[in-house]
Structures are given as structure tokens and as C-alpha cells.
């Protein structure tokens, strides 16, 4: 496993649609392992393959949401999604603050669906169907947008700069 460089905006790869993964081979497995290590090192809650200069439809997400606002986050769950698509989105939406590892020092207020259903393959090629709500749904939408060449700043209602020490648990970098 290796920590890869994260591509920062502006970069063409961030604005291009990623290619479908046709074969899950050793090279793809290495990329997934590297993406997980890179995301954890950043630190972030999600990373799309184009963010490490790989134009493939792969996303890794690691997140644990507290059951109550006063509690510590639950144990984090790791998701590896190959060729993910959002099959359902709730009509109910919410504006939330997002960061992005490819946009250091930038936060944005983005409206997203409160719940989504994601279909994908896991790293073994087995089909997955995940129903997510809240922050996990937001993270999935953000990362899948990366695979479609859509940047969170394009969906933003407000964009603002922050100092590096202002990034918090409430405003994680995705």
C-alpha cells in the first residue's frame, strides 16, 4: 500500500467522467488499497479514484455517524464501491457544509438529498445495494459526483475559504 498524491483543482481529470471498471484485477486491488491509505492519511471521509489521478469509477468511504449529537461517532464503516450509481434519491433535501480533499481550504454549502440508494460492486465484484441517510448519503453523493466530473463547487449555494485549523468534524473533507 502507498499514499498517493491527491489531485488539486484545477485539473482536467477532476472534470471528466471516469471510466467503468471492467475487470477487478490486482492493479485495481492495489489502487483500492492505496486509496484507503491516502484517504485515512489526508484525513478524509471519502475519496474517488480521479482524485488520485486514476480515471476509474471507484470510491472509498469511511464514516461513522453518532446516534445522538452528544455522542462520539459509532465505529467507522469502510465502503469500497466499484462502478457505483445512485438508483434512488429522496425528494427531501438539506443544505450542508462540505469540504473536499481536492479543494484544500475551501468549504461550500451544498444542497443534497437526505437519503439515497447506491448500487455498486464491492472489491470482490459482488453486487452491493446500500441505503444511506444523513451524512453518509451526502458523502456518497459527493464522491459519485467526482466520478461524473461534477465538482462540489458547481452545486454550491455558497463557497468560502477557511484556514487549515478551521476544518473540524462538523466540516470533514470528503
Feature-to-residue mapping (PLM):
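Active-site rim/adjacent substrate-binding subdomains
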Residues: 1-141, 146-174
Amino acid at each position: 500500500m502507498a499514499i498517493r498524491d491527491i489531485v488539486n483543482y484545477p485539473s482536467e481529470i477532476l472534470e471528466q467522467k471516469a471510466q467503468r471498471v471492467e475487470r477487478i484485477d490486482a492493479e485495481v486491488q492495489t489502487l483500492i488499497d492505496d486509496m484507503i491509505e491516502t484517504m485515512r492519511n489526508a484525513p478524509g471521509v471519502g475519496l474517488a479514484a480521479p482524485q488520485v489521478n486514476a480515471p476509474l469509477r471507484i470510491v472509498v468511504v469511511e464514516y461513522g455517524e453518532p446516534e445522538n449529537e452528544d455522542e462520539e461517532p459509532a465505529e467507522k464503516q469502510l465502503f469500497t464501491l466499484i462502478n457505483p450509481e445512485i438508483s434512488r434519491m429522496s425528494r427531501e433535501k438539506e443544505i450542508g457544509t462540505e469540504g473536499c480533499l481536492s479543494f484544500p481550504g475551501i468549504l461550500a454549502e451544498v444542497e443534497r438529498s437526505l437519503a439515497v440508494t447506491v448500487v455498486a460492486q464491492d472489491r470482490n465484484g459482488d453486487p452491493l445495494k446500500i441505503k444511506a441517510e444523513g451524512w453518509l448519503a451526502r458523502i456518497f453523493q459527493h464522491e459519485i459526483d467526482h466520478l461524473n466530473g461534477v465538482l462540489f463547487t458547481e452545486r454550491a449555494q455558497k463557497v468560502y475559504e477557511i484556514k487549515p485549523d478551521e476544518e473540524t468534524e462538523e466540516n470533514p473533507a470528503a
